[in-house]
Amino acid sequence: MVRIAHISDPHVGSPYFVPNLMNRVIEELNEMRPDVVVCTGDLTNEGYRQEYKNWVAYRDRIKAPIHTVPGNHDARNVGYLHFEELIGRRDWTAEVKGVRVVGVDSSEPDLNEGQVGRERYGWIREVFSEPAELKIFALHHHLLPVPGTGRERNTVADAGDLLEVLITSGVNIVLTGHKHVPYVWRIEDMYVANAGTVSSLRLRGYTKPCYNVLEFEDDEVKITRRYPFGGGSVIAHFRLSTGEQYHRELEPPVQQRRTPTARQGE
């Protein structure tokens, strides 16, 4: 079995960052012993060097290999330079027991919006062209809109073109972060799993800090949402070969009040 932990948006340096949550998640990850940890960005709050160094102190306590893409907060204040020095490459590939994971930087300096860009499409197709039991793509920004996240400026600007590249490349799962709302979409045979914030109280509606765990064995994939200090639920469970979907459980991530219509108010 391959186990991949997906964490996102710790926001070290934010007044809403909770060290106790991050410490607990590190303990849980080390007990779980995943084959790899994928972090989809916003390690920092403002991209400052000291925030990066503080994140590295947490990261270095995680025993599993960890691969990271930058988020929009990490690209602030020329923070992408610190990312390259202290974290590593912004675009990368990783192989884990027949699973190929590809990460790409979708951030733009000092902008909240993001894009992947056509100059990367050829490389993405190339790295996914070799056979793999499971193909995973990771980026920070949303690939598809997520309910309860406000105006749709949170997807990458080139989402349509990128979707075409990923689907035609046979990608099975996309991992994203950004707006702190956990959710899963299915489009054709590809699943898009968004993670919440792992250690921040910048929460939308009634969501809670959480992270995802992906388990893959014998053609079967299970994605579980876990909460620090206990609890969680399976949010997707399916077979790759048949597309058969055993389970998809999504709680309403953001409580939305029903607005009375004019007639109801009369």
Residue map of PLM features:
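Beta-strand-turn-beta hairpins that frame and shape the catalytic cleft
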Residues: 1-5, 93-103, 129-136, 186-192
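N-terminal active-site segment of His-dependent metallophosphoesterases
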Residues: 1-54, 58
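Active-site neighborhood of phospho(di)ester-bond hydrolases with catalytic His/Asp-centered motifs
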Residues: 7-8, 36-42, 66-72, 105, ...
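Active-site environment of divalent metal-dependent phosphoester hydrolases
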Residues: 12-16, 45-50, 72-79, 109-112, ...
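Extended active-site neighborhood of metal-dependent phosphoesterases/phosphodiesterases
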Residues: 49-130, 161-167, 212-213
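Short acidic, glycine-rich surface-loop motifs adjacent to enzyme active sites
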Residues: 131-148
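Conserved beta-sheet core of the metallophosphoesterase superfamily
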Residues: 151-220
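A short C-terminal boundary segment appended to hydrolase-like catalytic domains
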Residues: 216-266
